[in-house]
């Protein structure tokens, strides 16, 4: 015997609450997953920001060492000049100071030189040093305009050897004397030997113009491609279109990555 229509309606009404209970459970589970995912993403973002801050602090320490080498060199050089040291005495002192500067900065390959009495004295003399028009060099002009402050140039191609270099320099505006360090790619390699990255993490160090100075990546790619990739990231950061709050990019291997960055006091 078939149940009456009223019985069917009562059974149907009993099934409705069960459906809504099931729906509520599903929604609760989805909201829980969404909330968990948001928490994980936020934790990942905070960790990325902390790492960027930590790496920037390490860069600042290296920058401080370079500044100290230049500042101390300038102070001692001016003291020697005030004591009327001869050119030979100045050159002997500078040779010793350059050796100590190399030890302090962790690499014998750092090119150190000075300008005294219109002459360049170098730790590793290059061809044409006696006729090199340093007064017209952008690094000298930039340092001269800084009125004795230490400057860091952007990366450029050295006229002496055709290699990429960053020059750290200070010039005494009265005498025109200068103390100079040239940082080549291997110097940045040495200073980052202890870099500890998270698994699959990538690290890029750029100058103020976005030129790549050092990198460590978990994938294989041509250096020129990496350089262009990083320049584009820097362009977006400077334009304000790439921020840490929502930055998500595809790297050269096709992997999705978050982007975290800090700018150091010298513009790196």
Predicted regions, residues:
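Extreme N-terminal signal-anchor transmembrane helix of membrane signaling/transducer proteins, especially
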Residues: 3-42, 46
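Extracytoplasmic/periplasmic ligand-binding sensor regions of membrane-associated signaling proteins
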Residues: 39, 106, 121-194, 249
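Extracytoplasmic/periplasmic sensory segments of membrane signal-transduction proteins
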Residues: 46-149
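Solvent-exposed, extracytoplasmic
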Residues: 90-105, 178-221
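Amphipathic coiled-coil signal-relay and dimerization helices
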Residues: 113-126, 165-169, 210-217, 260-261
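Hydrophobic alpha-helical segments, especially N-terminal targeting/anchoring helices
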Residues: 114-115, 158, 206
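Extracellular/periplasmic juxtamembrane segments that couple receptor/chemosensory ectodomains to their
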Residues: 177, 219-220, 224-268
């Amino acid at each position: 015997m078939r149940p009456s229509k009223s019985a069917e309606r009562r059974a149907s009404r009993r099934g409705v609450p069960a459906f809504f209970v099931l729906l509520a459970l599903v929604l609760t589970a989805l909201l829980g997953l969404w909330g968990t995912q948001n928490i994980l993403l936020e934790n990942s973002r905070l960790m990325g920001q902390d790492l960027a801050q930590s790496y920037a602090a390490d860069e600042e320490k290296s920058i401080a060492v370079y500044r100290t080498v230049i500042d101390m060199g300038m102070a001692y050089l001016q003291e020697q000049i005030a004591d009327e040291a001869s050119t030979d005495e100045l050159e002997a002192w500078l040779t010793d100071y350059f050796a100590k500067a190399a030890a302090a900065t962790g690499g014998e390959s750092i090119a150190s030189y000075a300008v005294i009495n219109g002459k360049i004295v170098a730790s590793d003399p290059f061809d044409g040093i006696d006729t090199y028009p340093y007064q017209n060099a952008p690094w000298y002009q930039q340092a001269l305009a800084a009125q004795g402050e230490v400057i860091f140039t952007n990366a450029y191609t050295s006229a002496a050897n055709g290699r990429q270099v960053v020059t750290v320099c200070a010039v005494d505006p009265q005498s025109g004397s200068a103390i100079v360090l040239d940082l080549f790619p291997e110097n940045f390699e040495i200073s980052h030997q202890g870099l500890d990255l998270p698994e699959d993490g990538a690290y890029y160090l750029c100058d103020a113009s976005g030129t790549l100075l050092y990198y460590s990546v978990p994938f294989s790619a041509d250096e020129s491609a990496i350089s262009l990739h990083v320049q584009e990231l820097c362009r977006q950061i400077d334009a304000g279109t790439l921020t840490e709050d929502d930055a998500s990019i595809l790297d050269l291997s096709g992997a999705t990555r978050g982007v975290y960055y800090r700018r150091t006091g010298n513009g790196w």
